[in-house]
Amino acid sequence: MTTYNIKSTVITNRDATPKVLTDAYVSGGNLAASQGYVQTFGAADAAGTIYRMCQVPSSARVESVKIQNDALATSAAVNVGVYWPTFIPVGAGLSTSVAATVINTALFASALSVVAAAKPTDITNSSGNNSIVNQELALWQACGLASDPGIDLDVCVSVSTAIQAQGYIGLKVTYAK
């Protein structure tokens, strides 16, 4: 077996000649957070229901995504992903037809059970879609967009298996900018 001395992107950039600047959202950036909560309606919350929880700048790198919830019945499950905002700012260079549509429905979590009440739980890569490599990228890149739209994107919880009880769901996204 051989031993190696392998460098991450940050260390490789530091050691390069000439030095390569690492984006502040990867090393040395400031952390910020956005959070929100909703109350479910109970039996009316069918698969496909979307809860718009918070907004994150498209150019930010997501540090963590934490969800907490009340017990929401016998088979309830949700996805946590990224959507276009419900309002596209004038001058953003985007068609208003993308407003409120999905970008990546399960970037952070897929079919996550919300049957039992849960304290804040980190789901940054619960789905397997937000891989270790993606976690060093800006949100727009991690979502698979071709370019940075330069606006805040919505982080949403979408119902994948009907929620049959009334209760609260909360989400907190910490990001570097």
Give, region by region, the residue ranges found by the protein language model:
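Surface-exposed, low-hydrophobicity beta-strand/loop segments enriched in small/polar/acidic residues
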Residues: 2-177
